[in-house]
Every structure is written in structure tokens, then in C-alpha cells.
């Protein structure tokens, strides 16, 4: 069994040992603090059916907590919108912010287990960067994660995954994610 004090996630160790040096050489950084690294990963689940049944938000939060490995926060409406039948403070979805070891563990599971299980998967879009080194992607089915028991799921939910890096440009961020074996299609 692994000792908690000495355990390091696989991708974190890979970053320290090989990726950091490769990025420093590729972009010619003079200082180690200039090298881009992962800052956080935000998982967001907007549950459209929450307007009719608020229990679905709780169920979505439980499933997101299983996927992330930490408790999900329920997000609420900031203001009322009559056209969508939304009232202020009404629960609409849930989110989780991952940092540290859990972030690296989630990214490892996403790249190596979840994405290959997506139907008709041909790689993630290489153009989904925001101009400041952050990458956003969506999944239509949360059941691709091994933590979710398909038999106990009432409804298949989609989710947004935002990978925030300290990179200043999209090219730096793409190079960082490619080093982590993110399967870009372009």
C-alpha cells in the first residue's frame, strides 16, 4: 500500500521530471517560475431540469462529487428570469474546483480513462483556448468516468471542464497540455 506522505500523482511527477525541462527548452525561459504549470481545474454541471425538479441538482452534485473526489458546491441563480422560470437563489447546477494532487489525479483519469470512453471520440478541439492560456471543454455524458455506476444513473448529464494554467499564451498552454498527452485533434 502507498504511504500518504510519499505519494505523488503520476502526472505531477512527470511534470517535475520531464515536462518542466522540455517546456523550458522549447520556449527559452530564463527562470523556472516562468514555466507554465496547471493552476486549477473547474468542473461545472448546469442542470437545466432543475427548474422543474430541484432534487436533480442534489443528485448531480453527488455524482460530480464522486467524479472529482471532493464535495461539489451547488450554484444558485443570481437573479430572477421570468422567461426561463428561474427565481433568485434557485439551485441551477453545481461546481467543483480542483487544485493540487486531486487536480493531477483528475486530469490523469480524464485523459487516460474518460476521453477514450466517449462515443465517436476523435480528439479534443485544439482551438478551445481563451487567449490567456486556459482551456475549456465540454462532455455530453458524465457516465464516461469510472466512478459513476451506469445502472444507478437516472439521467445522463453533461459537464464543462475548464483547465486553468499559468501560461501567458495559448501556444504555451497547448504545449503544456500536449506534454500531459491531451489528445488534440488538430
UniProtKB/Swiss-Prot annotation:
Keyword field contains Zinc-finger: no
Keywords linked to the UniProt accession: Ribonucleoprotein, Ribosomal protein, RNA-binding, rRNA-binding, tRNA-binding
GO terms assigned for molecular function: rRNA binding; structural constituent of ribosome; tRNA binding
Lineage top rank: taxon: Bacteria
One GO term (biological process): translation
Any matching Pfam family: Ribosomal_L5_C
GO CC annotations on file: ribonucleoprotein complex; ribosome
Classification via InterPro entries: Ribosomal_uL5 (IPR002132), Ribosomal_uL5_bac-type (IPR020930), Ribosomal_uL5_C (IPR031309), Ribosomal_uL5_CS (IPR020929), Ribosomal_uL5_dom_sf (IPR022803), Ribosomal_uL5_N (IPR031310)
Quaternary structure, from the entry: Part of the 50S ribosomal subunit; part of the 5S rRNA/L5/L18/L25 subcomplex. Contacts the 5S rRNA and the P site tRNA. Forms a bridge to the 30S subunit in the 70S ribosome.
Annotated family: Belongs to the universal ribosomal protein uL5 family.
Stated name of the protein: Large ribosomal subunit protein uL5
Organism: Paracoccus denitrificans (strain Pd 1222)
Gene name in the database record: rplE
Amino acid at each position: 500500500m502507498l504511504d500518504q506522505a510519499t505519494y505523488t500523482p503520476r502526472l505531477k511527477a512527470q511534470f517535475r521530471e520531464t515536462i518542466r525541462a522540455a517546456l523550458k527548452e522549447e520556449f527559452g525561459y530564463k527562470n523556472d517560475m516562468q514555466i507554465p504549470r496547471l493552476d486549477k481545474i473547474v468542473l461545472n454541471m448546469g442542470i437545466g431540469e432543475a427548474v422543474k425538479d430541484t432534487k436533480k441538482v442534489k443528485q448531480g452534485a453527488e455524482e460530480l462529487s464522486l467524479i472529482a473526489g471532493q464535495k461539489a458546491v451547488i450554484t444558485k441563480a443570481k437573479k430572477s428570469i421570468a422567461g426561463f422560470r428561474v427565481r433568485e437563489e434557485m439551485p441551477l447546477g453545481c461546481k467543483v474546483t480542483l487544485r493540487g494532487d486531486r487536480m493531477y489525479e483528475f486530469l490523469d483519469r480524464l485523459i487516460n480513462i474518460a476521453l477514450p470512453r466517449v462515443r465517436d471520440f476523435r480528439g479534443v478541439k485544439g482551438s478551445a483556448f481563451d487567449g490567456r492560456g486556459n482551456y475549456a471543454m465540454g462532455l455530453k455524458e458524465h457516465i464516461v468516468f469510472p466512478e459513476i455506476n451506469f445502472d444507478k444513473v437516472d439521467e445522463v448529464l453533461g459537464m464543462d471542464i475548464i483547465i486553468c494554467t499559468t501560461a501567458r499564451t495559448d501556444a504555451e498552454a497547448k504545449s503544456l497540455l500536449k506534454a500531459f498527452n491531451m489528445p488534440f485533434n488538430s
